[in-house]
């Protein structure tokens, strides 16, 4: 029943005369009350709970989740299309399983529908019944036949099937291989007999987010489903993960082993070690009567190592702080003097050389047989030889990986890290990339952070490098300032020996923030890419500079 005009007129006047209200929704006209989903709130008309206004101003129902194969007719209420059922119309109805059966002979359920087929010797009629047909009996179809204008022929129950060459057997159509399947970019196609479906890529899972289903990344690290070693850190990536060994461990991340640490003090105090043999050799000096030519070289036992606990490089923190060379060298000399005093006891050795038979206490003659028994190795470090050649140069930065005042940093955005390796003479370390690190074309970067350089017109960068092994990879050097400029590259080293590279850096180098050593893995399985002592010299590179090989 319509309200009296006396009541309706005051409600209409503001809208007609251009008042604040501009829509009949704000004044509860009775005509709106007959629309579905419209409710009266006091003197106003608005969409009921569970309904919302569309762009045409009509209230429409809301369903969450949406009706997949149907329409929303009320709040969270779906009306399914024929062939589908369920709360959100996602379940297929098996028409072949209901009673009465829709087909006389064979019934094949399809997605959202069904198809009828007749036994051999029968023909399918429009009303889904079958009639005898001698022609169909001769065809001997796999799934049945149908009557066409050209005559009876075999049919397949799905659009994902096709008739074989004999015209009787149905073969599967691989929609994934034929590009007929349409899957989102983050899903992959899986073929089935007569159809296909879309599945999330490996490392992703299907979730309902933002009113739709989507494939999201699986965080294997958070779910603890990764195979990383207990001594490795798990780093989640899109669709996968990475394993990196923790500080103090080495390996591929799946298997990590402790980096061995050998103490110099333990070696010297072990029973029957080289300490006793040195005393024996010193006692033998009085028996020598032949004049010998002395070589002023300090021997080191091959088994003695610099303790790795003092290695200034930290793979966990990514940054290496250089140590004070003078302070540590002073401590080593004091420790050496204390050990010599313990060995001498109350005896004192004359620190002078007698031409006929007396040797200094800290020098050994190569003609003494006991020297071979001691298995002594005379240390000739290539780094020292290299620096002797540059002793007259103005060195601005002098860096190595065991001594020196400089900062080294691993790149956290690359594919693998550089690792410290023992030098051949067991004294100190250099940085290397083994051939088994990473995969082909993977990149590992090592940065040398430069301090505030004194402005100069030119600089020369000197460094020792080695590419050992067949097809081990490439070594590049970048100079980082406003942009990363490739300054040097080496792809192979035929003999695999240590060499020294030099790069002339011209005016403007004082604005450089770092020098980057980049290793790119090849397909070789043996060898390594290595870098050692780095020098930054003020001025031009010397013309008489010779590469140091070792």
Swiss-Prot record:
Coiled coil stretches, renumbered: 327-357
Keyword vocabulary terms for this entry: Basement membrane, Calcium, Cell adhesion, Coiled coil, Developmental protein, Differentiation, Disulfide bond, EGF-like domain, Extracellular matrix, Glycoprotein, Repeat, Secreted, Signal
MAM domain ranges (all copies): 397-543
Carbohydrate attachment residues: 394
Cysteine-cysteine disulfides: 59-72, 63-78, 80-89, 96-107, 103-116, 118-130, 176-189, 183-198, 221-234, 228-243, 245-256
Keyword hit for Calcium: yes
InterPro entries: ConA-like_dom_sf (IPR013320), EGF-like_Ca-bd_dom (IPR001881), EGF-like_dom (IPR000742), EGF-type_Asp/Asn_hydroxyl_site (IPR000152), EGF_Ca-bd_CS (IPR018097), EGF_dom (IPR024731), Growth_fac_rcpt_cys_sf (IPR009030), MAM_dom (IPR000998)
GO CC annotation, single: extracellular matrix
Tissue and organ distribution: Expressed at basement membrane of pelage follicles (at protein level).
Statement: the UniProt record of this protein carries the keyword Disulfide bond: yes
Annotated region (Disordered), positions in chain: 295-354
Family: Belongs to the nephronectin family.
Role description: May bind integrin alpha-8/beta-1 and play a role in hair follicle morphogenesis. Promotes matrix assembly.
Designated name of the protein: Epidermal growth factor-like protein 6
UniProt organism field: Mus musculus (Mouse)
